[in-house]
Amino acid sequence: MQFFIIGTDTNVGKTIVSSWLCLHTAYDYFKMIQTGSINGTDSDILKKLTYSKIHKEAYCYKEPLSPHLAAKLEQDEININNIILPNASNLVIEGAGGLLVPINQQYLLLDIISYLMLPVILVTHSRLGTINHTLLTLQALKSKGIEVVGVIVNGKPNQDNCDAITWYGKTTILAQFPFLSTITKTTLRNIPLTQELKQLFIV
């Protein structure tokens, strides 16, 4: 299976959740578009936290900006026809920023996901505002006919928020991923996959 991991925003925990999933499932990892490489890449993080095969990014830019701006600074433009998925049966693909982040002058990240038509796992935060952010993202995905297999909520557990997202978003909470003060292979390994995730990833 191949799953697209996207977030309701930047810095909601896509990379840590991707690391957790890859560590437990041995899935390959592919960061489609990387910005901010001057500060290190998400692929570098996966190399430290997992044993997975890491595939080279389709596009990688230095500045931590929206992909269309980061590319422009380097006199480049992202061509979605050049984004070719790795030949891997079991693959976690991580998006860049939020769903409506511009990729170039024509396309948003949503358009790429719609073109690929892969099932999506949505990562969101547990703090105030998550219900609105998550429901808007779910609505945008569903408007394009994209399959959302469920939501992973990252941060301090908040069952009320999870219940609201489940009810109004007509979706499934696949896991509540806890806040970790230290992130290592060991701390990630100590958080077991939920039964829902085991069934999805067939582990």
Swiss-Prot record:
List of catalytic residues: 31
Biological process, per Gene Ontology: biotin biosynthetic process
Signal sequence, renumbered to the chain: none
Enzyme class at the top of the EC tree: ligase
Cofactor section: Mg(2+)
Pfam families assigned: AAA_26 (PF13500)
Gene3D superfamilies assigned: P-loop containing nucleotide triphosphate hydrolases
Subcellular location field: Cytoplasm
Catalytic activity of the protein: (7R,8S)-7,8-diammoniononanoate + CO2 + ATP = (4R,5S)-dethiobiotin + ADP + phosphate + 3 H(+)
Binding-site positions, Mg(2+): 15, 42, 94
Primary location: cytoplasm
Cellular compartments per GO CC: cytosol
Keywords annotated in UniProt: ATP-binding, Biotin biosynthesis, Cytoplasm, Ligase, Magnesium, Metal-binding, Nucleotide-binding
Source domain of life: Bacteria
InterPro entries listed in its UniProt record: DTB_synth_BioD, P-loop_NTPase
Residues given in the record as substrate binding sites: 35
Pathway the protein contributes to: Cofactor biosynthesis; biotin biosynthesis; biotin from 7,8-diaminononanoate: step 1/2
GO MF annotations, alphabetized: ATP binding; dethiobiotin synthase activity; magnesium ion binding
Similarity section: Belongs to the dethiobiotin synthetase family.
Function: Catalyzes a mechanistically unusual reaction, the ATP-dependent insertion of CO2 between the N7 and N8 nitrogen atoms of 7,8-diaminopelargonic acid (DAPA, also called 7,8-diammoniononanoate) to form a ureido ring.
Subunit relationships: Homodimer.
Protein name as it appears in the record: ATP-dependent dethiobiotin synthetase BioD
